[in-house]
Amino acid sequence: MKDSVDCPSILPTDRTSVLSETSTLVGSSSHVYSRHAPMNSYHNSMNSNIYHSPKASSPLVSYKTSSPVLLKRATAPVLPSFKPKEQRYNKPQGCSLITAVELGKIIETLPDEKVLLLDVRPFTEHAKSIITNSIHVCLPSTLLRRKNFTFSKLLDNLTPSEQSVLKSKLAIDNLRIIIYDSTANQTESSVSLPCYGIASKLIEFDTNVKKTVSILMCGFPQFKILFPDHINTNTFNSDCISSAEPKSPKTNLMNSLHNTAPHMTATTPLSSPQMNLKLKVPDDSRSDHSNFSSSPSPRNVLSDSPMSSSSPISALFKFQLPAPQTNINQMFKFSQNEEIMGLETYLSAVNIKEEHERWYNNDSAKKSLQNFQFPKNQNSLEKDTNKDKLGFQIRYENLSKNYEKEVIDSVIPEWFQHLMSIPKIELVSQFQKLDFLEKRRLNHSVSFRKKENSFILEKPSSYPEQLTSTSSSTIMPPKFPDVNKVQKRSHSQPIFTQYSKYKSMLSLESDSDSESDDVIISSGVELGAKNRYKDIFPYEHSRVILKKGLQSSKGIKHSHSTSDGGILDNYINANYLSLPRFSVEQNSSFQTTTTTTRRVRYIATQAPMPSTVHDFYTCILNNGVPLVLSLTNDFENGIEKCYRYWQEGNYNGIHVKLLEKKILKMPSTTSMRKNTMGTQNSSLYSAGVQGNSSNYSTDNDNDNDNNNNNNNNSNIAVTAAACDDDDDDDDDAILIRKILLTYHDQEKPYELLQIQVKNWPDLGTLLNPISILQAINVKNHIIDTLFARNYYQNDQLPTILVHCSAGCGRTGTLCTIDSILSNFEMFEMLQKEFVKLKYPAKLFDPISWTINIFRKQRISMVQNINQFIFIYDCLLFYFRLRLDDITERTDGDGSNKDNISLSALIEQIEKLEILQTFVDDKLKELPQ
């Protein structure tokens, strides 16, 4: 999607430190990287995304089990097109270059008849603003280069009024002719083609008359800034030309219609959408539509500009493409502003994905192309009776037929059941509202506040050296935020866990961003080497501020004092994420029907690059992160998505050692397919891993004995020598790595557990969510065990780190799924309040609400509509697993119970030795 590029220098905003008071202080001594560590150079940091993948030949979409679906809204990402460098020419002999100041003096001192201003810019630019009294003369590049197309021929193709003015002025001796376009920094050896071509033709035209031809060096934009009084933005060149030639009466124009052709410009509306050779000349009582302070409308015609229809290039003059209907001042460039916001776009993307799923689930369709029919036969059209429903809604209907209503009510919340019955377009429009709210939030609230905060980089060339700045500070054990404290939402508070008034937060329609919800993007905009993508920046109020104990770096001046060092030291592209915490009224009598797991705080961040591995581990140490969820492969289609930060090495003073790796193969959903078949090919999830349907294996990849039906849970560790090589890993499996971090001359060890889901593509989804839910199960097991063994106190809020490639789409999707599963009690309470308030026209959707909250803390959480729909799929799959836990339902032939249930998956996790040893090792870190 994006590469790390240099970004323009923008003044950052620095609020009160968003780091908790008791965060771990990381100071790393200066060491040389080992052979596995990245080269610490500016060149490598800027080219960290162009490594070649050993799997570059792998297909974009693999039709294995859990095959990913890669869709970016309605279309795939567009590769940048090649744009050749603009051709420049030497300044013509007999022509001079003048500055903007000199042109300003000429306009102010010389009379108008002694000055001729020629605007050679394209008509779309000329139509917006011009230098007063300019005449627009623009030729195609082919005619500019053609020497036999002289200035006399150019005059013959202009309008009669323009011809009259130009001929009368060109007959005057000592005429000052100034040619300008939008090109800046024109020199003796570098002149733009339009200025060169027109100047050359003017110098050779009528050499008997003395004239001075000059080219504006700085271009029109700079002159507009220096002399705004000489700029006209309300008229076009027909109005700029003095009325030396009286306008012909309407009758004369109509009588000479056979010698004229319509001339496109922007003052008179077209009489009909069809081609009409009649010139409609408005009277003097025109409305305000002739006042053009913005770009002109294309549906207009100049009333007094007839041109000869015999001219071969008459149709090329003043042509302009349709301008946008609205001129939105975009303060920040992001996908929602660049892409179409119509509902049809979202529906089209959803339909394409679901059509792919239906094709994949149809075994007969995959066997041969002979089944293809166009158009579809009548029988297939009659069967398609669920056009107004999404795929997960159809699966829910089939699921509800297999279970009693009481059982479903005890597992599936009421709000989720209601969402299963609403029309497809209403659910899709929820995501459209989310995009609209984020677009409004960014365009309205993004500001850089230059007056309040100043940031001056005196020596940009010293930036790469600043990345290696180190100090030897004492590292303190991490402490965790107290969730019982009532916290006010502010720019200085990264933890969004205040007791909130929920009336205005129950639906997207009632969302209104207050001043406390304003987003600021400042820090990191200028740090291109620390950002993986050029349009993903952290919000200032929730960004993670690193604490390395560094002194202010050389060459940096701050308008405020801070103990966190400079922006080069404390910056990482990461944000804190957390849902608001609501208090349940004491006299409230409702009881929740679903279980609730431990709440956590998330750190959403981009995948590390070679230049940011040290910052990545510093973030983990500062916040006491025990668990990292990695949702991306290291390479996709030959493009690096994540640097292998788990490789052993010395990363600027932080030593990384890979202790152990487990490969968790996902169980098959073949038996699930049989048990969830309803009517007409409607399985709950039919795409699964082929092989054993009852085993959840934990091994390395050479174990292919999957035909037995025993529950053999072998805990086979991959050797340390093989840990660095992931080429043979099964992409459908979950990888668990135990990593040891040491720092300060190996005096302070810190263990970290990484869970990696490799088969989730960028900007895409999975056909089978079992690997996502199993990763969440591992997370829950670790957090619950740490609480049970008193690693955390009951009032502490653990922090986990989640990353994909950009830290937005897949990261936001998983954080939303986990937050819904962890906050059933809160959402059931909010639903009851929603019913009390009686919002008949509004929809209570905790999923959309959660995404909206997260998008106020980090940009573009859940990037596209298919990831949004995938969240509902995952929740339905979770409820399906829970239903199997509480029922004794058997297969249709009365055989054994389906072994794939939530309890079966959790049981396999509890037997993993790597998790048990990790918790034991974490408890040993407490005395530090």
UniProtKB/Swiss-Prot annotation:
Among its keywords, does the record have Phosphoprotein?
yes
Task: Give the Rhodanese domain ranges.
Answer: 111-232
Q: Could you confirm whether the keyword Cytoplasm appears in this record?
A: yes
- UniProt modified residues of type Phosphoserine: 248, 297, 368
The catalytic activity, as recorded, is: O-phospho-L-tyrosyl-[protein] + H2O = L-tyrosyl-[protein] + phosphate
Q: Quick one: a GO biological-process term for this protein? A: regulation of sporulation
Please note every region of biased composition (Basic and acidic residues).
Answer: 280-289
Q: State where the protein is found.
A: Cytoplasm
Q: Where is this region: Disordered?
A: 247-307, 467-487, 672-713
Query: What top-tier enzyme class does this entry carry?
Result: hydrolase
| UniProt feature, compositional bias: Polar residues | 249-259, 265-275, 672-691
Please tell me one Gene Ontology term that the record gives under cellular component.
cytoplasm
Name the Pfam families on file: Rhodanese, Y_phosphatase
Q: Where is the Tyrosine-protein phosphatase domain?
A: 502-878
Name the Gene Ontology molecular function terms of this record.
protein sequestering activity; protein tyrosine phosphatase activity
Which SMART domains does this one have? PTPc, PTPc_motif, RHOD
Residues annotated as catalytic:
804
Bias-annotated ranges (Low complexity): 290-307, 692-713
Which UniProt keyword terms apply here?
A: Cytoplasm, Hydrolase, Phosphoprotein, Protein phosphatase
Q: What is its EC number?
A: 3.1.3.48
The record's misc note reads: Present with 768 molecules/cell in log phase SD medium.
The task this protein performs is described as:
Major phosphatase responsible for tyrosine dephosphorylation of MAP kinases FUS3 and HOG1 to inactivate their activity; it also has important roles, along with MSG5, in the inactivation of FUS3 following pheromone stimulation.
Q: How does it assemble?
A: Interacts with HOG1.
**Its family?**
Belongs to the protein-tyrosine phosphatase family. Non-receptor class subfamily.
User: Under what name is this protein listed?
Assistant: Tyrosine-protein phosphatase 3
Q: Which organism is it from?
A: Saccharomyces cerevisiae (strain ATCC 204508 / S288c) (Baker's yeast)
